Amino acid sequence: MWFRQLALFRLPPDARPDLAKLEAGMEQHCFAPPSGLEWSSQGFVAPAGHAPDRLLHPLAGGALATLKREDKVLPAAVIRDVLESKVADIEAREARPVGRKEKRELKEQVTDDLLPRAFTKTGRTRALLDVQAGWILVDAAGQKAEALVSALREALPPFPARLPHTQLSPGSAMTGWLAGEVPDGFELDCDCELKSPGDDGATVRCSKQDLTAPEVRQHLDTGKVVTRLGLVWQERIRFVLTEQLELKRLQFLDVLEEQASQAGDDAPALFDATATLMLGELRHLVADLIAALGGETEA
């Protein structure tokens, strides 16, 4: 249930979505497995097993959403083996070579024949919609995070979620924090990555190391900048901040897990307690992090 990473998308104050309208739109984009000749499909599914009819699971000040994607897996070697067999059969039966164009057409035919029987690979991407604070918090990064936001946009256009921009770039801020003082509420953890400027610059990765040690600081003296930095927030959440303002290796510490477990052994109650607690904690963490980066800018 606990998120393991975080991508941030901003919802403008004057464009916070109506969750009832959003859920109605999501119902038009429910997940369905890819049909015979489709390579993949995606759509929304219920985030909570105990509420199978709800595509948005309501929480205090927000909701939880899940996008499911299914991809068919058809190895190129399988297609090649079947194609070679067909080509050999034609050449033996008709005593003629099979040309390039015909091979291409045969390959398309073989692919179409095999696709309905292909294995599938399934994945889910979850997001917290923090309507109260105006954030979409996605448990993914890169294309997967963008795909979920795009799916929400299709469900309720225009859904103007965007990547946030801060006064200080994460890279320059992290470099300053490693060289000097970390903002209130945060402390250095034990991992970081530093790079020399330029596309071909050297990269240094420190793991399970005291980041205040002289051998770490000397990399800053040579002009390297921090591109990833391990931080702990309020002794409650551990994470690695990246220069893209993504939170990797997100870990909710024991105090939060113990707090959630007070809901008891009832699975639905534990799910709801965990999701509600997670949304509240991430809401405060993101607010503190954005403030530490000097606040937001328009672009």
Curated annotation (Swiss-Prot):
Protein's GO biological process: DNA recombination; regulation of DNA recombination
Gene Ontology terms, MF aspect: double-stranded DNA binding
Keywords of this entry: Cytoplasm, DNA recombination
Presence of keyword Cell wall biogenesis/degradation: no
Cellular component, GO annotation: bacterial nucleoid; cytoplasm
Localization, UniProt: Cytoplasm, Nucleoid
Pfam families for this protein: RdgC
Keyword Cytoplasm listed: yes
InterPro entries: RdgC (IPR007476)
Annotated family: Belongs to the RdgC family.
Main function: May be involved in recombination.
Name by which UniProt lists this protein: Recombination-associated protein RdgC
Gene that produces this protein: rdgC
